[in-house]
Structure formats: structure tokens, C-alpha cells
């Protein structure tokens, strides 16, 4: 089980959740995503990892409650648990360092 440590409503129907997931936080890189399952039988919801904190062992997701599953997920609060969070998935972003002249 993965505990929601913090939930904020950033704008109407747009939510931020900080989730306790130490192994995921240690492996996450910019540009990757994760998959949330609220219950064992619920839909798999892919979401971008918005932030991660290795020391705290947390990852942050931001989502808009527009479909049935994300609307249901928006009703979860700090202290509630997700059945499963899988990740990090996907290829990390590649950073290109350009000089100020380029």
C-alpha cells in the first residue's frame, strides 16, 4: 500500500498528491511516469512524476479530475492509501546544455 501524505487542490479540479514510495523516489528521473491503481481491481492510471524527494522517499503527481477514475482519485485524502504504484516508467528526459550564445 502507498500512503498519500499530502493533497492540495491547485485549481478547480486540479490536484497535487505527495505519495510515500521510497523505492520509486530513489529511481525516478526527470521525464518519467508512474502508474497508480487505487484498488486491486481498479483501472491503471498513468501519471507524470512531477517531483520526487529521495530523502523523504516520496513522489509527487499532479492530475486533473476529468474522467471517472481521476474524479474518484480526487476524493482520496492525506492518510488514504493506493493499492499499487508502479514505476518509474518511460525514458528519462535528455538535457542538452547550450551556451548563452546558441
Give residue ranges: language-model regions.
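Ferredoxin-reductase
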Residues: 1-78
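FNR/FR-type flavoprotein reductase catalytic core
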Residues: 71-102
Amino acid at each position: 500500500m502507498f500512503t498519500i501524505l499530502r493533497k492540495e487542490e491547485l485549481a478547480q479540479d486540479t490536484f497535487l498528491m505527495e505519495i510515500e514510495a521510497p523505492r520509486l523516489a530513489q529511481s525516478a528521473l526527470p521525464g518519467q511516469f508512474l502508474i497508480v491503481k487505487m484498488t486491486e481491481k481498479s483501472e491503471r492510471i498513468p501519471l507524470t512524476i512531477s517531483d520526487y524527494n529521495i530523502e523523504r522517499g516520496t513522489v509527487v503527481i499532479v492530475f486533473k479530475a476529468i474522467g471517472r477514475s481521476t474524479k474518484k482519485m480526487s476524493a482520496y485524502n492525506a492518510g488514504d492509501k493506493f493499492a499499487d504504484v508502479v514505476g518509474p516508467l518511460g525514458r528519462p528526459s535528455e538535457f542538452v546544455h547550450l551556451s548563452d550564445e546558441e
